[in-house]
From Swiss-Prot:
GO terms for biological process: flower development; negative regulation of flower development; transcription elongation by RNA polymerase II. InterPro entries: RNA_pol_II-assoc_Paf1. Expressed in roots, leaves and shoot apex. The gene is VIP2. It comes from Arabidopsis thaliana (Mouse-ear cress). Pfam families: Paf1 (PF03985). This is Protein PAF1 homolog. Component of the PAF1 complex (PAF1C) which is involved in histone modifications such as methylation on histone H3 'Lys-4' (H3K4me3). Involved in regulation of flowering time. Required for the expression of the flowering repressors and MAD-box genes FLC, AGL27/FLM and AGL31/MAF2. Required for histone H3 trimethylation on 'Lys-4' H3K4me3 at the FLC and AGL27/FLM loci. Involved in the control of seed dormancy and germination. Residues 55-65 have a biased composition (Low complexity). Residues 88-116, 128-154 have a biased composition (Basic and acidic residues). Belongs to the PAF1 family. Keywords: Coiled coil, Flowering, Nucleus, Transcription, Transcription regulation. The lineage of its organism: Eukaryota, Viridiplantae, Streptophyta, Embryophyta, Tracheophyta. Residues 117-127 have a biased composition (Basic residues).
Length: 589
């Protein structure tokens, strides 16, 4: 079945190497006059000139293989006789006539027209008839049919050429698609009749630089010297020994554990090793025991190990009181202390000497250049001598590093610290046998200093600053700290037998400083005045649960009229946010 082609004349194609061109017309016949192309269908490029007569292919010498084969069949005759060729227009130049002639010649080569018909057509007289639209349509139709016949004839020629090729070439090689009608323009895959296969060669270019001979360092012993491999290193040989390791033991014979009757003499070296060193702790004259290490004498090359512990350094940290220092001075002076205590006359003389010393001009203990401004009699405060007071020692300024109070003026910060409240709590943790005890430090809020603390009906808002771990050191037998109160031209003193050491609550071992466990803050703490004040420690007071209360506590505090100290009574109120068990904690400072 013939494929449809668009109605335009075929372009001139160069002769292919595989296809056979038709033989040219005999030179004896005069060349026919080709009809001129229509003026309304110009080509985009000028047609090539007609080839000279000597450029046609000769079938005989160039294609000898076709001499022995059968000639291809002639093309079928046209269906209708061609119309009369009209005369060219008058305005057509000689060049246009030559172009038309060349196109007609190229078409004759492809279609192989009959020379007799061309000869007959050349003798026809030229007519001046103009081609109509109907005639032009019929002519186009005939040209299209002629092109189809030429294409069919060309396909037959190709098939006949393939059938005449040797079997070896047809079986091994498939027809390339480039030789079909749908030809792909590819310069690298042009069809050729060359049968041999070409091998692609890409030879390296000559070296641009001069060659160099380099020596390779080789270890001559690497093939002869024996080395242990990693597998041999990982191998663990099995050692089979006797079950008793060469030492026979009889568990039923207990006589082997008895000491020998005659002791064998030891060598001096072994006897020195078995000797125990007797560490003697000398007792000094002042009664302090000092442990001396055996490395202090004779072994200076050893490094002395220093142990940091509160037990070993406790005696060194304890300072002598005034009474002990006085006794030590008397011992050095050769005075018998027992004789002075039992001698009544000596006591009376010392008392009178103390009164005489008070009348003399006082001298400062450290700076002798200071002069006294006012001298007051110092007497015991008998009205409150039965009360107990405690001195609190902080490890640092309580609110100096606080976020809110640290930025205040030092005078305002001191005013807040003077009205601070300490409240003790006991927290029941995971270990019920050893509950955790701490003191809460609270100061009035920033705008609560103007309120009257003596008014019991007025509530004062306090801020919870931090918690402290506390430790009480009683010293009732020999108090070295006294509380002095100045009132009405006299100075009254009271002993402070209790010392309260406060340390900031820090993170436990294994926790960072940001993971300090904060305890719930009570919403209210009531402070009331009492006639007598004492220090009482309640182990089960202020037990907290895991719930958290308010962030600030409102309290009331009363100050004593005598100015000796401040006493507070803390009673938790029965509300939803209070978690104390109702016991009271009374403090005085």
């Amino acid at each position: 079945m013939a494929s449809y082609r668009p109605p335009y004349p075929p372009l001139p194609q160069p002769p292919s190497q595989n296809s056979l061109a038709p033989p040219p017309p005999p030179p004896s016949l005069p060349p026919p006059v080709p009809p001129p192309p229509p003026s309304h269908q110009p080509y985009s490029y000028p047609p090539p000139p007609p080839p000279p007569p000597h450029a046609y292919y000769q079938q005989g010498p160039h294609y000898p293989q076709f001499n022995q084969l059968q000639a291809p069949p002639p093309p079928p005759p046209p269906s209708a006789p061609p119309p009369l060729v009209p005369d060219p227009p008058r305005h057509q130049g000689p060049n246009d006539h030559e172009k038309g002639a060349s196109k007609q010649v190229g078409r004759r080569e492809r279609a192989k027209p009959d020379p007799s018909k061309h000869h007959h057509r050349s003798h026809l007289p030229h007519s001046k008839k103009i081609e109509t639209e109907e005639e032009r349509r019929l002519r186009k139709k005939r040209e299209l049919e002629k092109q189809r016949q030429d294409e069919k004839h060309r396909q037959q020629m190709k098939n006949s050429h393939k059938s005449q090729m040797p079997k070896g070439h047809t079986e091994e090689k498939k027809p390339t698609p480039l030789l079909t009608t749908d030809r792909v323009e590819n310069r690298l895959k042009k069809p050729t009749t060359f049968i041999c296969k070409l091998k692609f060669r890409n030879e390296l270019p000559d070296p641009s630089a001069q060659l160099k001979l380099m020596t390779i360092k080789r270890d001559k012993d690497q093939f002869t010297k024996y080395t242990i491999t990693s597998l041999e290193k990982l191998w663990k040989p099995k050692i089979f020994v006797e079950p008793d390791l060469g030492i026979p033991l009889d568990l039923l014979d207990l006589s082997v554990y008895n000491p020998p009757k005659v002791k064998a003499p030891l060598a001096p070296e072994d006897e020195e090793l078995l000797r125990d060193d007797d560490a003697v702790t000398p007792i000094k004259k002042d009664g302090i025991r000092r442990k001396e290490r055996p490395t202090d004498k004779g072994m200076s090359w050893l490094v002395k190990t220093q142990y940091i512990s509160s037990i070993n350094n406790e005696s060194a940290r304890q300072s002598l009181t005034e009474k002990q220092a006085k006794e030590l001075r008397e011992m050095k002076g050769g005075i018998n202390i027992l004789h002075n205590l039992n001698n009544r006359e000596r006591q009376i003389k010392d008392i009178e000497a103390s009164f005489e010393a008070c009348k003399s001009r006082p001298v400062h203990a450290t700076n002798k250049n200071l002069q006294p401004v006012e001298v007051l009699p110092l007497l015991p405060y008998f009205d409150r001598y039965d009360e107990q007071f405690v001195v609190a020692n902080f490890d640092g300024a309580p609110i100096a590093d606080s976020e809110f109070f640290g930025k205040l003026d030092p005078s305002i910060r001191d005013a807040h610290e003077s009205r601070a409240i300490l409240k003790s709590y006991v927290v029941a943790g995971s270990d019920t046998a050893n509950p955790e005890k701490f003191l809460a430090y609270m100061v009035p809020s920033l705008d609560e200093l103007s309120k009257d603390i003596h008014d019991e009906n007025e509530e004062i808002s306090y801020t919870w600053v931090r918690e402290y771990l506390w430790d009480v050191q009683p010293n009732a037998n020999d108090p070295g700290t006294y509380l002095v109160s100045f009132d009405n031209g006299t100075a009254s003193y009271l002993p402070l037998p209790m010392r309260l050491n406060l340390r900031k609550k820090r993170a436990r071992e294994g926790r960072s400083s940001d993971e300090i466990e904060h305890f719930p803050v009570p919403s209210r703490v009531t402070v009331r005045r009492r006639s007598t004040v004492s220090v009482i420690e309640h182990k089960d007071s202020g037990v907290y649960s895991s719930r958290v209360g308010a962030s600030s506590s409102k309290m009331r505090r009363l100050e004593d009229e005598g100015g000796l100290g401040r006493s507070w009574k803390h009673e938790p109120e029965q509300d939803a946010n209070q978690y104390s068990d109702g016991n009271e904690d009374d403090y005085s400072e």
